[in-house]
Swiss-Prot record:
The gene is CPK9. Residues 91-349 form the Protein kinase domain. GO terms for cellular component: cytosol; plasma membrane. This is Calcium-dependent protein kinase 9. The modification Phosphoserine is found at residues 69, 255. It comes from the Eukaryota. Its main location: membrane. It comes from Arabidopsis thaliana. Residues 392-427, 428-463, 464-499, 500-534 form the EF-hand domain. Residues 14-54 have a biased composition (Polar residues).
């Protein structure tokens, strides 16, 4: 399951390897971008094209996995509208692979064969609205429909019990696409072409099989194994829909950096997937997205303006053929935008084509690291500031929290948030309230605690005042040495469950501008206040 940003006001969680999140990278500001107006999220019906409509929905078959007991009956709170079934009857769950807003992904072993798979366990507490439940069923339907195709994760089946919907699928043990590129330490146009070819192949397969993806981004691609020549696999179809011939789509969904201009204008078709793939190619070649700003509004403005930078480094050293393909994929007019089939035949992209084997500037890898990892430390620092902020500074927010937390439990539930927003005069739909809930719920436990609420609602300039930044710095600087060492950073990040060893080292490397192996106060403040591709988080209210 995932989020769209029909109107997203909240603090977003970082994308993690193997998780179930599909968050918008940055949230909506208090002003809406031009050329579009917020509206309630609408969900396309999971109708299959062609004669397939005469068959039972694939998700029914997926839910009715081998071993289903004929004595079990469908429960009233069923999401899949089928009998409950314990996934542990067929699979042994192992270690946690990733955690996201909607649940946890585990390594699992099939009891009958001993084969390893991934099990994405999605908490039913997170599936609150009718739209959530429809989306869940549609995601299963689409995954089963596409399963078995190259570069698309193989889907095994869906199992629902009282607490969760469990999706069992192919284990992609090679990790995230960008992690592999960064770890190699060197990179060529030919390597970028190989990656892009597989991503566009996913687009071609989806469109051929009647599916519009709508959320192509690097985080949604994993590597099938740790092998050097491992296939890239698309793993997330939570925002995908079946294409209806002649239908004009109007939902604003996706992730900010990768959204096509026609999505913002609420009139689009399958061409949006080519645009998103073009954004990924631009990042592969340069290390940064072509459109970014301090706010989501700024990103949208840049997308609608349409200026693409081919002058800054490393573009002067990138081949003209590569730039030609990027331009064709990022053509603003969807009618003139290149098709998936034509992308695959482009001289630069096709196998054995013009893409050079000459290494791309190492700065590109550095930028990719920043693009992927920087926000984790910023987010943790903001949480630390919120935990230690003076009570008098947040008296109003404290009262607001108490008013919304009607049962005095110390946490805000979905229902409490919905009622609280209504009292404040909000006219958000249930789906939009749910998005706010997911955005502010940093630890993913289904409710917003006091610190999460303060972090999401305080004005950012107050959180980032000199006094508060210094308090946060002191929190990390445990030995009061005036520096945050790698050990202190590792301890802090792991305390909050954020980041593996590789990410910790990447964060230190990105922030440590004088390369002395530690972070001083000036470097810390510069990191907190600088504009970078992982943007600052907006307010909940």
């Amino acid at each position: 399951m995932g989020n769209c940003f029909a109107k997203n006001h909240g603090l977003m969680k970082p994308q993690q390897n193997g998780n179930t999140t599909r968050s918008v990278e940055v949230g909506v500001t208090n002003q809406d971008p031009p050329s579009y107006t917020p509206q309630a999220r609408t969900t396309q019906q999971p109708e299959k094209p062609g004669s397939v409509n005469s068959q039972p929905p694939p998700w029914r078959a997926a839910a009715a996995a081998p071993g289903l007991s004929p004595k079990t009956t469908t429960k009233s709170n069923s999401i899949l509208e089928n009998a409950f079934e314990d996934v542990k009857l067929f699979y042994t769950l192992g270690k946690e692979l990733g955690r996201g807003q909607f649940g946890v992904t585990y390594l699992c072993t099939e009891n009958s064969t001993g084969k390893k798979y991934a099990c994405k366990s999605i908490s039913k507490k997170k599936l609150v609205t009718k739209a959530d439940k429809d989306d869940m069923r549609r995601e299963i339907q689409i995954m089963q429909h596409l399963s078995g195709q190259p570069n698309i994760v193989e889907f095994k089946g869906a199992y629902e019990d009282e607490k969760a919907v469990n999706l069992v699928m192919e284990l992609c043990a090679g990790g995230e696409l960008f992690d592999r590129i960064i770890a190699k330490g060197h990179y060529t146009e030919r390597a970028a072409a190989s990656v892009c070819r597989q991503i566009v192949n996913v687009v071609k397969i989806c469109h051929f099989m009647g599916v519009l993806h709508r959320d192509l981004k690097p985080e949604n691609f994993l590597l099938s194994s740790k092998d050097e020549k491992a296939l890239i696999k698309a793993t997330d179809f939570g925002l995908s829909v079946f294409i209806e011939e002649g239908k004009v789509y109007r939902d604003i969904v996706g992730s900010a950096y990768y959204v096509a201009p026609e999505v913002l204008r609420r009139r689009y078709g399958k061409e949006v997937d080519i645009w998103s793939a073009g954004i990924i190619l631009y990042i592969l070649l340069s290390g940064v997205p072509p459109f970014w700003a301090e706010t989501e509004k700024g990103i949208f403005d840049a997308i609608l303006e349409g200026h693409i930078d081919f002058e800054s480094q490393p573009w002067p050293s990138i081949s003209s053929s590569a730039k030609d393909l990027v331009r064709r994929m990022l053509t603003a007019d969807p009618k003139r935008r290149i098709s998936a089939a034509d992308v695959l035949q482009h001289p630069w992209l096709r196998e054995g084509g013009e893409a050079s084997d000459k290494p791309i500037d190492s700065a590109v890898l550095s930028r990719m690291k920043q693009f992927r990892a920087m926000n984790k430390l910023k987010k943790l620092a903001l949480k630390v500031i919120a935990e230690n902020i003076d009570t008098e500074e947040i008296q109003g927010l404290k009262a607001m929290f108490a008013n919304i937390d009607t049962d005095n439990s110390g946490t805000i539930t979905y229902e409490e948030l919905k009622e609280g927003l209504a009292k404040l005069g909000s006219k958000l739909t249930e789906a939009e309230v749910k998005q706010l809930m997911d955005a502010a719920d940093v630890d993913g436990n289904g409710s917003i605690d006091y610190i999460e609420f303060i972090t999401a609602t305080m004005h950012r300039h107050r959180l980032e005042s000199n006094e508060n930044l210094y308090k946060a710095f002191q929190h990390f600087d445990k030995d009061s040495s005036g520096y945050i060492t790698i050990d202190e950073l590792e301890s802090a990040l792991k305390e909050y469950g954020m980041g593996d060893d590789a990410t910790i080292k990447e964060v230190l490397s990105d922030v440590d501008s004088d390369n002395d192996g530690r972070i001083n106060y000036e470097e810390f403040c510069a990191m907190m206040r600088s504009g970078n591709p992982q943007q600052q988080q907006p307010r909940l209210f």
